A protein has these predicted regions:
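A glycine-rich, aromatic-flanked flexible loop/lid motif
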Residues: 30-31, 296-302, 340-351
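Iron-sulfur-cluster electron-transfer modules
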Residues: 17-28, 50-56, 63-276, 291
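Short, surface-exposed amphipathic charged segments that create phosphate/polyanion-binding patches used
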Residues: 293-308, 353-359, 418
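A short, charged/proline- and glycine-enriched loop
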Residues: 179-184, 304-310
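Short cysteine clusters
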Residues: 31-37, 41, 55, 105-111, ...
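Cofactor-cradling patches in redox/metallo enzymes
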Residues: 191-283, 317-418
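Acidic, Ser/Thr-rich low-complexity segments on the non-lumenal side of membrane proteins
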Residues: 5-45
Length: 418
């Protein structure tokens, strides 16, 4: 396995319009200002200072030179039109685009999903974040603390990594060992340190035990995948963490990785490939659905859910990023749940607000993104919101006031096996 030890010049991000790749600049110029990205953006809906349409138009303005005074669309929330200008070789932040605009993005890719011109808004935002982080060192909120924790401890919270699997001590979950092959390697992710999400992981292990799966947990050697570091623009820390975790995995023998965290799945399945690795990585809902389909699990309808209206919230990094929207629904159907869909679902599901490091940068708006998503669930009379991501669990459960119960799909399946 070969990793590059130094960042390329382009990996330090984009600080001026001229530093974007030519094909990015061409795509920005293709914008027809239809506003579909604006209508889909969760940050814009929450009143945070991000309008993806305005951002793209600002980048076009910056490349040709001039001000944003002629922009006729909806303004960026809280930022009046006519106060920003740019030039091809002039710094983007904050003459053309405010730093808070970049840090408001949850990287959910709803804008990209809707764009008829296939513009990659999120990639452009992360490019500009890299310049802010690696060149200027201006990550807001708790971002600097978390990045330091990741570099020093391999965990976002600065925890002792040996405690990552404390939740499994009474479950007889085997720990992966060099020289002991297993079919499935369970990678828990950062959610393992959260007491609420530990219930999800315990439910998942219970399901694996019930099905007789040959598995092992990664154990105390597990370190962060680097997802948050990359979203916050710290490419150097991402590559450091990727080398560390990939080195750990290289010492083990397994057929596939299963994880309950779509961010972990996306990093290992897709982003580590550029670093020279290839893993077969499954989300836990896909893996459990396969167990049910093969007859290794025979769940029954849970009595406690018989009269409940259940909806499913699609995690952005599972649905939009990796195209998996059917397996969780098939799995819920197999335990007798008839899903009541929210208006925005599947690949067009609304973001919970938990991705892209957004809870760390914490840019204020008029309301919270998870409040909007819970309002979607309330609108259809949902009693339970089924989820498949630790970030979604934390964000939706953090909504204040009466709300539907939030349960991971693994918890619902485990209840159906009792």
């Amino acid at each position: 396995m070969l990793f590059r030890s130094l960042l390329d010049a382009k990996e330090y991000g984009v600080g001026k319009p001229v530093e974007f790749r030519w094909n990015q600049l061409l795509s920005f110029d293709a914008c027809v200002q239809c506003g579909k990205c604006e209508a889909a953006c969760p940050a814009f809906a929450a009143g945070q200072p991000l309008n993806p349409k305005k951002l793209i138009q600002d980048l076009v303005t910056g490349m040709v030179g001039g001000s944003d005074a002629a922009y006729a669309g909806s303004p960026t929330p809280g930022l009046p039109v006519g106060h920003h200008a740019g030039e091809p070789n002039r710094p983007i932040v904050s003459s053309l685009i405010e730093a808070d605009t970049l840090w408001s993005c949850t990287t959910c890719r709803a804008c990209v999903q809707e764009c008829p011109m296939l513009i990659e808004h999120v990639d452009a935002i992360v490019d500009m974040r890299r310049n802010q982080t690696l060149v200027h060192g201006t990550v807001p909120g708790k971002g600097p603390e978390v990045l330091a924790n990741l570099r020093e401890t391999g965990t976002a919270g600065g925890y002792d990594k040996a405690a990552r699997y404390d939740w499994a001590v009474d479950l007889n979950a085997p720990v992966a060992q060099p020289g002991k092959p297993v079919d499935v390697l369970l990678v828990a992710g950062e959610g393992a340190f959260d007491m609420r999400y530990q219930r999800t992981l315990r439910a998942l292990v219970t399901v694996l035990n019930k099905a007789g799966v040959d598995y092992a947990v990664l154990g105390g050697d597990e370190t962060d995948t680097g997802d948050v570091a990359r979203r916050l623009g710290d490419e150097a820390t991402f590559q450091q963490l990727a080398r560390q975790l990939a080195g750990t995995l290289a010492n083990l023998t397994f057929k596939r990785i299963v994880t309950a965290d779509p961010h972990v799945m996306h990093s290992l399945r897709n982003e580590y490939r550029s670093l020279g690795t290839r893993y077969d990585v499954l989300h836990h809902t896909s893996f459990i659905a396969d167990l049910v389909a093969s007859g290794k699990l025979s769940p029954k309808a849970a009595d406690a859910l018989r009269d409940k209206r259940v909806t499913y919230h699609d995690p952005c990094y599972l649905g939009r990023y990796n195209g998996e929207t059917d397996a969780p629904r098939k799995l819920l159907k197999s335990i007798g749940i008839q899903i009541v869909e929210m208006e925005r679902n599947g690949k067009r599901g609304r973001c919970c607000g938990g991705g892209g490091g957004a809870p760390l940068t914490d840019i204020p708006g008029k309301q919270r993104i998870p409040d909007i998503r819970i309002a979607d669930a309330r609108a259809i009379g949902a009693d339970v919101v089924a989820v498949g991501c630790p970030n979604c669990t934390a964000m939706l459960e953090g909504v204040v006031g009466p709300r539907p119960e939030v349960l991971d799909v693994a918890e619902l399946v485990a209840a159906a096996l009792e």
